[in-house]
């Protein structure tokens, strides 16, 4: 299921890259595997992970989609971005002021999501230009969306903007 970091923009027809920073909940990552398989995106996981990659709930959520997606595990965010040849990175956070729908995505972009419990660390957010820190609108008294739901919303918007390449 897991490959060594070797992806480049457009690698194996992958026009988008999803990066999960230190994910903690196996079903969310499993759902992201299935989503990336269906949208033709690659999935990058940044260590430490909150679970083992052979976790039963991860396999159940990803079903048999592992063969249709490039899943790569990296020791850190910099290693991941180096492997991807430093793509444009969009960080999704409830603290951003820019909406994801006001952004023009391009082939090879990387969509970065934080931990389920704490989001992205400030040091990571500060390394991303403010115009590339994006939020998904929600009701004012809510803290956040489920990670796999946020990934799905963002990936499908980016894929839509690109014209759903490879989709039917």
For each feature predicted by the language model, list its residue ranges.
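Post-transcriptional modification and biogenesis factors for structured RNAs
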Residues: 1-168
